[in-house]
Amino acid sequence: MQTLTHGGDWAGYRAEFGRDPLDFSANVSPLGLPGGVAKAITASLATADRYPDPLCRALREKLAAAEGVPAEWLLCGNGAADLIFRLALAEKPRTALVTAPTFAEYATALGTVDCRVERHFLREENDFAVTDAILDAVHPGIDLVFLCQPNNPTGQLARPALVEALLRRCEAVGAVLAVDECFLDFLPEGQSLSAKRLLSTSRKLIILKAFTK
């Protein structure tokens, strides 16, 4: 059985040590639950006896309006990790590329479909930034590339021009580029840095976002 690797397992900590932890294992908002979310949860309690819409139609329409993209481009899941595993299962890549260091869930998900994971190592002399060197790592044998934007755990952000160049390189070799933007909205200029401007130009681009951030 696969062991839990994602952070936030406060229940397991409590069971083992008998007290609640100060949990820094998952990068969630320190500001707590937004008031609007609490009100929406309270308002929906009357219909809690029903199964939710499996296609998340209303949610997708709201997200589409907020993000400025068609609703049919959106797929909702139980967190970004759920969608990372779904992507690996849907694509079943033979070989994938990730940076190192980066979010460990990519390699874990790829391992469930026996995918060979190649790592593009980020260098200390470059302050662990993603540079143009990553383009050479995307060879014709690569089926899927994960790019964390900004990267977890380094916090480094790849230049938008480099992200576009990486997408074009992926297209050239037939690979899918998955850009994880779960932390991008923490940046004041996050929306302007998003790769979503490229969605209308390519069928090889997937963008991940998450509510927990």
Where are these regions (language model features)?
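N-terminal "arm"/small-domain region of PLP-dependent enzymes with the aminotransferase-like
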Residues: M1-R50, G141
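Conserved beta-strand elements of the Class I
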Residues: L22, L75, T95-L97
